[in-house]
Amino acid sequence: LSVQVHPTDAYAQEHENGQLGKTEMWYVLDAGREAKLVYGLKQNCTKAEMRRAIADGTVMKYLQKVPIHKDDLFFIQAGTVHAIGAGAMVAEIQENSNLTYRLYDYDRVGKDGKKRELHIDKALDVANLKGSAEPKQPLRVLKYRQGVASELLTRCKYFEVYRMIVNTERRQKVHYRADEIAFRVLLCVNGCGTISYEDGNIP
């Protein structure tokens, strides 16, 4: 994944024809022994310093690399510079937006032999260029009910994420209801199961 940043809602509405910005969360599904991600900067820098680092290929000296493990969580607020490294697989839960500003792409070229477009001016407009502390895992709230553990992973104004841990020793049902206010996305990250709904089943 390229080194990138997403705008806030306010910036996107003003500069991107009324679109939404993007705040997101990563849940690590799998990670190799050396897997890392980029989360913010390890030291303060100015826009001019970052621009020079992008131009001369030394931008990585400013980026904070964080070792990751299976089941880690990272809440990535709009404006946070970030990237996924090799050996990592994450589930990305995000605000309903596709706005991404690429800050650096490791000088890679596409199938056409050309480097991918960067969005340096807009990226520097929205990026938080202050040094970041190592990201803390969000507080997890765990509740038990009838053989199912419900774990609140993240709650913000854009989305809520829960992990359901089901007792596999017996067939267990977990009920969800979708309505006109919000929808639900179900992702099986371990084991197997069946989604049942009014018109049928999905294994």
Where are these regions (language model features)?
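Active-site region of the double-stranded beta-helix
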Residues: L1-K70, G85-C192, S196-I202
